[in-house]
Amino acid sequence: MNPVDQPPPPPLTQQPEEQAKEDHDDGDERLFRDPLTTYEYLDDCRDDEEFCHQFLRAYLTPIRNRQEAVRAGLLCRTPEDLAAAGGQKRKTPAPKHPKHAMVYIRRSCLVHSACATAHGKYDIRGLTLESDLAVWAALRGVPLPPDPQHFRWLNAGAFRRLVHEAQYLPEISRAAKRIALAVATGQYVVCTLLDYKTFGTRTHYLRQLCSMTEELYLRLDGTLCLFLEPEERELIGRCLPAALCRGLPVKYRTHRAAVFFHATFMARAEAALKDLYAAFCECGDGRDDGGNHNGNYGGGDHSSLSPSAVASHHSRLEHAELRLERNRHLGAFHLPAIRHLTAGDVARVQDSVSRDLGFADWSQTLVDDYFLLPAGWACANPRRGYAMYLASNAVLALRIIRLLRASIRHEYTACIRMLSGDVQRLIRLFKGEAALLRKGLAQNPVQRRELSRFRKHVHDLKRIRFTEDTFVETFCDFLELVQRIPDYRSVSLRIKRELLCLHVFKLRRGCRAPPTPEAVRVQRLLWHSLRHGDAPQDRTRLPQFSSALSDAELSNHANRCRRKAPLELGPAVVAAPGPSVRYRAHIQKFERLHVRRFRPHEVGGHAT
């Protein structure tokens, strides 16, 4: 066939999600550019700060009657209006009036906008609206349920890089940028490490792992009544915490889950599990090729092993050298020798642990005692299989507990070191400013006051010393100190709230974020915060967090913490993360109706 005669290729079809995103973006663009977009304002709460009233006066014009609607272009003049004005009726029928969008603005959303930004919620000032929302979502989105395929732990270095590379307002000084970076780092520590009672934090996950491991050992202790042979009961007893703590400076009855952090406890638990495999396993997979605990246990002859067990020797769980993603600076680690796993189970466990230490998989379960190992081992009788399953889960949980504790300690010390460096950097900046004024001889009273102010800032900053034991108290003192620095104090929260409300309610576009999954997540979280409200994490609320990351706190010994549910946004927010929009061709009531109040520099009414 001649290429000219070939039929044209069929048009490329788009996926439903991509098509929905494009339709949503086109709809938003029409709302921003249509000068006849109307707004209905709903009074559903009090306005104590007068922000809502001033926002309406600045950016919206009320429509009180039909004449004002005609002047605004929302309605055409009717034949009755023409007759009353002395005109003649139109003989031809009037053209069909197009439909225009009506956006619903709730006063509660305007009030809640105070804590829907990093400036209002966390006192991180000076960022542009787009960067502000990105930093705010990184901290506020910690309690969200993780995506098992894409979730990774956020470390302090990556978060500081996000804040450091963000876009700042042009009038922000170098000192204000450094203060914003330090405040963001302190809020990161509180949101990810010191908030024990919120889903998504590492410390909450560590407490739940400790509670789960205690439950596993309690159930393993309960299996002793199922065995009559003294040798079998002794093997199970060696796997229990009371025997593993023998000779150690910590006791399980006194310190409870804090003993799980001890290295010797972990090594003894792994050795006891090997002995349990050697005695209870009947399929041959329990024989380890790296040790000899029971005569011929772990020898090089695999003739007695099943074919599946021989194949599994090439992909043992403990053979792979793993590194925690986004925390590779913690070094390589190996998982314990867990048996009776298929090649798929081994790959799944290794991937889950190296990705996020099993957090995403754990968060998807509804049963607290379930972890990463598959249930239903058929290598022995049900009694022995159940005992091996409980002991294996406990040993795997112990290894992850120690890895998680190490990552928490590393994050905490790294953040304290970074904050101390920020304070020293601020001291050098203010000393430099004071030196410039001093070299200029401070010739007038204004310069002399500035010189005195810089010297006072240096004196106050020298008293800020971040330590592990007094982090929260020192951070509160730092927040109080920066409120006395004009470069940081003068950044307006009202302007940031106005920009946010203008963008959310389709009055003026404040940022042009690409339609990525992360942008959709930020939009949903933002609309949830505007609908339900939030509280600022300021100096009045921070003292409720504890600075002590002791073993008793991390293991939940002093204050037992139940498993918390993640932050659910709700189906309404997920389906429509934005204000309600309706299209109407006929306007019957003018109550609560508004249109844009365009500024003189906005030509043609295109608020872009």
UniProtKB/Swiss-Prot annotation:
Pfam family, one: Herpes_U5
Sequence segments annotated as region (Disordered): 1-33
Entry's localization field: Host nucleus; Host nucleus, Host nucleolus
Gene Ontology cellular-component terms listed: host cell nucleolus
Gene Ontology biological-process annotations: symbiont-mediated perturbation of host cell cycle G0/G1 transition checkpoint; symbiont-mediated perturbation of host cell cycle progression
Keyword Lipoprotein: no
Transmembrane portions of the chain: none
Residue ranges, compositional bias (Pro residues): 1-13
Stretches with biased composition (Basic and acidic residues): 18-33
Keyword field: G0/G1 host cell cycle checkpoint dysregulation by virus, Host nucleus, Host-virus interaction, Modulation of host cell cycle by virus
UniProt keyword Methyltransferase, yes or no: no
Entry similarity comment: Belongs to the herpesviridae U4 family.
Subunit structure: Interacts with host KAT5, PSME3 and EP400.
Protein function: Promotes a cell cycle arrest in G0/G1 by inducing the proteasomal degradation of host histone acetyltransferase KAT5/Tip60.
Name of this chain's protein: Protein UL27
Organism this protein belongs to: Human cytomegalovirus (strain Merlin) (HHV-5)
